[in-house]
Amino acid sequence: MKMTRLYPLALGGLLLPAIANAQTSQQDESTLEVTASKQSSRSASANNVSSTVVSAPELSDAGVTASDKLPRVLPGLNIENSGNMLFSTISLRGVSSAQDFYNPAVTLYVDGVPQLSTNTIQALTDVQSVELLRGPQGTLYGKSAQGGIINIVTQQPDSTPRGYIEGGVSSRDSYRSKFNLSGPIQDGLLYGSVTLLRQVDDGDMINPATGSDDLGGTRASIGNVKLRLAPDDQPWEMGFAASRECTRATQDAYVGWNDIKGRKLSLSDGSPDPYMRRCTDSQTLSGKYTTDDWVFNLISAWQQQHYSRTFPSGSLIVNMPQRWNQDVQELRAATLGDARTVDMVFGLYRQNTREKLNSAYNMPTMPYLSSTGYTTAETLAAYSDLTWHLTDRFDIGGGVRFSHDKSSTQYHGSMLGNPFGDQGKSNDDQVLGQLSAGYMLTDDWRVYTRIAQGYKPSGYNIVPTAGLDAKPFVAEKSINYELGTRYETADVTLQAATFYTHTKDMQLYSGPVGMQTLSNAGKADATGVELEAKWRFAPGWSWDINGNVIRSEFTNDSELYHGNRVPFVPRYGAGSSVNGVIDTRYGALMPRLAVNLVGPHYFDGDNQLRQGTYATLDSSLGWQATERINISVHVDNLFDRRYRTYGYMNGSSAVAQVNMGRTVGINTRIDFF
């Protein structure tokens, strides 16, 4: 067992309440709100951090219909997939999913529930807002929160009737249809909602062996229901949500490295089409109880996922069905009320994940390799987050989290008739801390500084590898130092930050696709600056601009890649958009024009596979035809810029996945109420 400590942070988080409780209440501020993101408007953790919140109308205007399109509205975030949608490659502030495709650098939450890693890329249904927290969020969110947190908050049913249907078509025979109905079942007591979604995003890649010409896309069917029991004049409420998602995809589609404008896949003669089917079931029970001084939240959530995946890899045909089960329980207590000197959040957390993988690599004439593996991972944690309001302008915050992680693996198989197998167990303890301080220079201008830790627990490879023992990799740990500012008025919003993150014992994937193994690759340093601004220069009109410059490198004492750039981290990025409303006698017109720039980055630790700088231009025009009818047209990637989204070495040559190119579409929404 190994205990990791950072005494100044952990002790600071523990001692802060004792110091603060010796002070008298000196201010009168708004009530602390506990949201699905665990943050509140008064807490230091919410104010002394770089964050972005995007509303549902802003998501709709930008055409964000799935989580992998969130970079359009969340500056600094990069999301692609490595092979297919099961394995997201995410980077934020120089922290990258190159470290582990099964544990993205940024964790996705939906209504406060962490999603399975293989469910990070998903369609969005009935979203109310999306929140991005940058930098390690380990004290509140625990493992795999080194780069930050994406929290999706969905619309909860209440006494207001809501309902709509949506429909749209776009390039490559793609289409989208959606139905939503929400409101009171018995007003003052019980509320409910239902959402149905069918989303087809076909590709245009060609397999010469089969003649298929629509590869590289996805087809998703999703349904969810919610019930909310909230009696009037009672201090408690309960909720239940259930959803099912099934997606079929043909995304394991690659072209030659230098053939990014081509449509023919780089495959051996006679290779079948790639195919993947993923089905995910989710259930959540929640409860809230409110007193004069405290609010208590309880969440219990379960996810079950199974997928089948077949794809050609050189002369081999790979079959990799997999099953996942995850359950999460969390009890959280937070202070309520005005004029508090100290605000506090305390919580207990448990997460248990179980996985089974069957894999088979077959040659045209005989089996090459087959294996069956079982892995488990469990986290037990207790956390505390505290804010001491020294004056009405100055506050300090501190937090501490104690986590106990354990994992196990058991696998067996055969390679060319030779059996192999092993098993193992490991456990680890972590103590994480964070400290921050913020000061309001004026009523509109805040400056802050923050030190925070993040980590990824020790564990085992998900995919068994012949010839390798069941040896665990050690926990990966990081610490982030940040200095930032935020300025906000009715017309201007501006935030900027500079940061430095040091990561040690990085967990990095290496090896051929389908046979990658995780190992600790040493240390890395990431430094950068970021800027985000919005100017509301006229009624109904706004101009957004953002940019970042990041240097993320393995240190010289890293065993495998010393001095190299960390994969999947662009050296710089920028974006700008103009949004407006033009009133006419025939209804409001809503134009939008957006440009996004992504800097050069690598797909491998050896820095041999490089994607250069590229920019895309998106445009849309909405028309509010009546109070209840909205029609919009959009053109994404107006100039049809083609670029690589992922690549790897296939023997002595490299192959790449490429983006879809220009997409033209039209959408219609009709509201019922």
UniProtKB/Swiss-Prot annotation:
Residues forming coiled coils: none
Origin superkingdom: Bacteria
UniProt induction comment: Induced in absence of iron.
Keyword Signal: yes
Residue ranges occupied by any TBDR beta-barrel domain in the UniProt entry: 160-672
Signal peptide: 1-22
CC per GO annotation: cell outer membrane
Motif (TonB C-terminal box): 657-673
Domain TBDR plug: 41-155
Alphabetical list of InterPro entries matching this protein: Plug_dom (IPR012910), TonB-dep_rcpt-like (IPR039426), TonB-dep_rcpt_b-brl (IPR000531), TonB_rcpt_b-brl_sf (IPR036942), TonB_sidphr_rcpt (IPR010105)
Other comments on record: Weakly expressed by yersiniae located in the liver and the intestinal lumen. Strongly expressed in yersiniae located in the peritoneal cavity. Moderately expressed in yersiniae located in the spleen. This probably reflects the availability of iron for yersiniae.
Protein name: Pesticin receptor
Organism taxonomic ancestry: Bacteria, Pseudomonadati, Pseudomonadota, Gammaproteobacteria, Enterobacterales
